Amino acid sequence: MAVAERLVVERASKTFSGGELTVFADLDLAVRDQESVCVLGPSGCGKTTLLRAMHGLVGLDEGRIVVDGSVVLRPRSNVAMVFQHFGLMPWKSVTANVAYGLELAGVARQEIAERVTRYVELVGLKGFERSYPHTLSGGMQQRVGLARALAMEPDILLMDEPFGSLDAQTREILQDELLSILQTTGVRGGRAPATMVFITHSIEEAIALGDRIVVLSARPARIRETISVDIPRPRTVASVVAHPRFVELRDRCWRLLRERTA
């Protein structure tokens, strides 16, 4: 039985500056239900713009993006995004930040309280519910952003380099925690892992988190190659790095990123 496609990008193109700057062109990508796809590419090639288009935050000049059979025109309640720079509201506590999206979605007050408690604890922030962002480390702030997204119990999780600004130790801890959540707990009320699209500059991170890696060219971005990560799950970052396939996959990604394209 074929696995359903949850998110489909069809001949997507995006320009800025009145059409003078083409960010990406003719992109086609299909992401299956419960699949984790990591996107690698040079700086400025449009990775973040593509992710924002998947969420309905920016429009396309050509092509379309389809989620569950419907064209994406605006943000959807079953899609959640985690931003690179946390995106927290500094005047709100941890609890209030995590609850914010649920309140906008009109979730019942009791359900909001239950979900906030569940996901704050899941990301390791129990005891910090009343804390404000300025009192938290970068890693803890990103945990808040992750809890806020997970609390929506989304079908699709969009991650825009969420660990890129963190130190190496904190980054690996959060990578392992994300793997654990997706592989064992799930984000839809514990029923199943969400579909995930994860933007990163780190080859190691892409291999650790992804079922497939999409390598983009320099701007205007096109898909150079899609690589299957044939390392079994469940995984940890350490187990991936120690796997015999890791070096080959890393070198293959490096070669693609280093090659100059027309």
Residue ranges and their predicted role:
Residues G63-P75:
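Conserved ABC transporter NBD signature motif
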Residues Y132-L136, M140:
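Conserved ABC ATPase signature
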Residues L40-P42:
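The feature captures the beta-strand-to-loop junction immediately N-terminal to the Walker
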